[in-house]
Amino acid sequence: MFRTMMRAKLHRATVTEANLNYVGSITIDEDLMDAVNIVENEKVQIVNNNNGARLETYVIKGERGSGVVCLNGAAARLVQPGDKVIIICYGLVAEENIHKQEPKIAVLDDDNQIIEMLGAEKAGTIL
């Protein structure tokens, strides 16, 4: 059996743009993608801390070092520049490997720069 487990997360990313007329997706600074091993065209879930909206889309590489986090297409209706979002990527893990798998979590500042890298989350942690 396989289970769907969180494998990567960009925590408290700041939305820099919302582009309604783009075809779709989320554009993410490639440095941030690399930090948590998210690849172009990979499916991600976005959770908006400001309004509670949750959506799924795919990733497009953004310019390295730019801090860009841009929701494109229909998703742009669910965010505003300045909103705080959590970007989560899941993967299928075989039952026997569940306890060996540890997610990569990058905690970001207001400029989408990494301030901390975490492994497994602990209950009660407030960031």
From Swiss-Prot:
Entry-linked SUPFAM superfamilies: ADC-like
Active site feature: S25 (schiff-base intermediate with substrate), Y58 (proton donor)
Biological process annotations from GO: alanine biosynthetic process; pantothenate biosynthetic process
Enzyme class of the recorded protein, top EC level: lyase
GO cellular component: cytosol
Location of Pyruvic acid (Ser) modifications: S25
GO-annotated molecular function: aspartate 1-decarboxylase activity
Pathway: Cofactor biosynthesis; (R)-pantothenate biosynthesis; beta-alanine from L-aspartate: step 1/1
EC number: 4.1.1.11
Main localisation: cytoplasm
Subcellular location(s) of the protein: Cytoplasm
Record: residues binding substrate: T57, G73, A74, A75
Catalytic activities: L-aspartate + H(+) = beta-alanine + CO2
Keywords: Autocatalytic cleavage, Cytoplasm, Decarboxylase, Lyase, Pantothenate biosynthesis, Pyruvate, Schiff base, Zymogen
Family under the similarity heading: Belongs to the PanD family.
Protein's job: Catalyzes the pyruvoyl-dependent decarboxylation of aspartate to produce beta-alanine.
Subunit structure, interactors included: Heterooctamer of four alpha and four beta subunits.
This protein's name: Aspartate 1-decarboxylase
Species of the source: Bacillus anthracis
Gene transcribed to yield this protein: panD
